[in-house]
Structures are given as structure tokens and as C-alpha cells.
Amino acid sequence: MIYPVNFEEVVGFDSIRKAIMGRCRYSGTQVKLFHWGFSNQFTEVVYRLDALDEVRNLQDRMPSLLQLAGADYTDFTPILNIENAFWEEEIWVVVVDVLQTYKKLSKGVSGRREEFPILASKVVELDAVDQVLLKVNKIIDEFGKVSVKASPAYAKLSQDIHRLEQETRQVVRGVFKELKTLGYTAETDVSVREERLVIPILAEHKRKVQGFVKDVSATGKILYIEPAQALELNNRLKELYAELRRERERILRALTAEVAPFESYLLSAMDALCDVDAWIAMCAWCLSHGAERPKISDEPRISLLNAVHPLLAAELQLRKSKAIPLTMQLDAARVMVVSGPNAGGKSVVLKTALLLQYMVQCGLYITALPESRMGIFHQLAIDCGDGQSIEQGLSTFSAHLKGLKEILDNAGPRSLVGLDEIGAGTDPRFGAPIAQAVLEQLLSKQSRVIATTHFSQLREWGAGISDVLQASMAYDVHALKPLYQLVW
């Protein structure tokens, strides 16, 4: 369970998700990352982190293997199942780029399965990919067009068109030269309108030129006229162009039908590269924020060494400042009560811990020393005491109580709970006992809890309990300003 529904927004993970999505190449990767989330399975979390390790290692040693090309062609694959439908040349170019990327990666890691087992397992359809590439490369040339060698008929039509175009051009240029000498033409050259060579004639001389008007300029001062001398040649060219288009479509239709049986392999290859694309984006984001892989164990614990909130650290860096790292541990002690002045950094401590735990269970490195130890939790919950809801007719404190009840109803030994200013928003005579009762309930459920407070009663209560760790935010009593350091 993740609580509340806007948990990611509260701790800042929504911004991290958007930043990672912005680094992706393929649209399918962005869809995957939109649905990407927290896992409470130890083996799955380790798998995700191992995948990042492999990408990081490969990026350091053979970065060219991770240079992705092409675009996501998944939305075009239904065409493969429609009779007489076909992929246009631009789609084939994209498919070739993607499959070449897949092939390059497959060849690069297949011989190093011990080093890159996850990546190698993602690119195993090499035989099918090779077959598709062979078929496509026979038809589509290096310029992304149907090759003149695609069929004997296509080759002959291309040759006939080339020969007739040259002949027609000579005739039209000859007429153009004569008319230019007479001063009938505009300053532009021979051009093409409706697949026919035409001459730009000044409007005042149009009746002096034998031919057919094919177009008029926006100002009406120039008419584009097909000279009568080229009419028969242009007509024949138009027929050849139509025949070439029909033959081109026949070739593309045949190629599409030939590749259609490989649809599942094409989808599998695209899906695999989307996974790799996601790992590349995640790894790049992590490294750009100085994140490292922590030690992972399948138990509900959290031990952070020199941890910072990545978004706060990035923001402060822009201001030429630095975030104050925090070190904290919830292992033998299950509850940490953090006290300190307003604006002293208590909420940042709470959100940093919850965010980093969420990040690692999403498969990301964390902004803390690699010696940090992170466990696996089944529930993550945070209540910041600012849940006023006009729609539900709830005051801030009522919403706070509602949130606490939701957390208590679902808490257990595998829960990590963050409670910011627990019990605040009402008379301290009532707020402090409520806060104490909630913490006692969470203790009895063996949950891990980080609670910030101003109540001295909570500090006194926790002082005599071995499972409760007392912490505070350091304050410079001489300068009268907070130091943003967690002390425990």
C-alpha cells in the first residue's frame, strides 16, 4: 500500500518520474515509465537495480552499444494484419533503425552473458531480426526509398522514366531558351507542376505562347505553361509515373505480407529496447544527481548515510549552495521522534527518508553513500498534516485524523510511516495524547516510523522506550538560526 494517493507528489517522486521520462527516446518507454512504480518484492527490486548496474557498466565500457536509433513502431503493427495494406517507406526506415540497434546490442552482450545477464536475456531474437532485415534491405535502399533493384519491372520503369525525363527536359529547355530571348519568361527557371515540366511566362505574354496553363502565381503576374511541344512527352511521363506508383505499392504490399508473420518478434524487439531505453534514462538521471546503489536486504529496515533529498540538492546547487546530508537509522529502534524549531528541516528529513525508500523499491539508486542499507517495505505512508479538503468538508485537523486512521488500519511490520507534526492543528492538550496513542499503536504493529513534533510530551514518552529513538534538528543558539542537521 502507498498512502496517500498523491504520495509521489508529496515526497517529490513525480518530478523525478517526469525528468526520467524526458530522457527517453521511444514513446513506448514513456508509457512504461508512466505506469512504473514501487515493488515490495525483494527479488524484483534486486533485478531492477542489477539492470541499472549492467547499463552503467556497459555505458562505461562500450557506450556505442547503448546509442539507440529509430522510433517506436508499435502503433503501426496492426497494419500487418490488414489485407492489401502496407507500410510506407518511412516506416520501414524506422523498423530497420530499431532492428539494427537491437542487433548491435545483441551481438555486443551475447558473448558476455556472465557480465550482462539481464541485457543479454532481453535481446535473444537475433535470428528472426536478421531474417526481417534481410528481407527489408533487399527492397529499401540506403536512402530510405524502394530500390530500383526491387523488381525487374520497377527497374525498367525507372530507366524509362529517367530517359524520357531527360528527353522532355531538353525539349522544354529549348523552348524556354527561345522564349527567354524574346523576353516572355520570368527570371525563374523551368519548374514542375502536376508532374509536368512548365515554363514561367509573364502574364502579359501568355497569348504569345502555345501551351497549357498549369498554375498561376499568387500575384497573378506569372503563369506556368506547359509548352505544346512537350505535351505528348509529358503525357507519356505521367503514364509511366502512374505505372511506377502501382509497381511501388505492389512491392511494398508484398514486403509487408512477407514480414507480417514476424509481427510478434517485431513487438518483442521493440518492447525489449523500450526496457533498455528506460534503464538508460534511469541510470542517466541517477548519475546526474550523484546517486549510488545502496546495500539491499529483505527485511524492514532503513539506514541512510549522508543522504540528501535529490530535488532539494539540485535546487540548492543552482543557488551555489549545498544540502546538509543526514544520517539516520531505523533498525533496532523502530520509531524516530524528531523535534526542533520551525523551518529547521524536520519535514525534509521525513520526506527524504520516504522518498529514498520509494526510489530504491522502484529500482533507482539513491542520493546517499553506497554503504547505506535499505530494506524492503510493503507499505509506505506519509501524513503531512496539510490535507484540508474543501470537497469533503474536512478541516485540516479532521483530514489529519482521517489520514492517521487510514495509516493505522493498514500498518504492519513491513510498514514505513512518516508523520509530520503529528497531532498538530488542535489544542496541545488533545493533540499530544492523540500523537502518543498513534505512535503506541504503530509500535505495537512493529511498524517503522519517523515522526516530527513540537510536543515535549512525546519526547518524554519516548525517553523511556528502547524502541524509540530521540532525534532533533541542530540549532545555533549564538547565531539564532537552524543548522539543518539531524542529531540523534
PLM regions with names:
Residues 222-223, 228:
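Divalent-cation-assisted or electrostatically stabilized phosphate/pyrophosphate-binding catalytic cores
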Residues 1-153, 157, 262-265, 269-283:
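Conserved amphipathic alpha-helical "coupling/scaffold" segments
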Residues 297-488:
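ATPase nucleotide-binding head domains, primarily ABC-like/P-loop NTPase cores
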Residues 31, 84-87, 108-115, 174-188, ...:
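Active-site phosphate-binding and catalytic loops of NTP-dependent enzymes
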Residues 272, 278-313:
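Charged, amphipathic alpha-helical linker segments immediately N-terminal to NTP-binding catalytic cores
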Residues 16, 20, 31-34, 195, ...:
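Gly/Lys-enriched N-terminal cap/neck module of very large, oligomeric protein machines
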Residues 45, 49-52, 59, 73, ...:
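Amphipathic alpha-helical coiled-coil segments
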Residues 156-205, 301:
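Extended, Lys/Arg-enriched charged tracts that mediate electrostatic binding to polyanionic substrates
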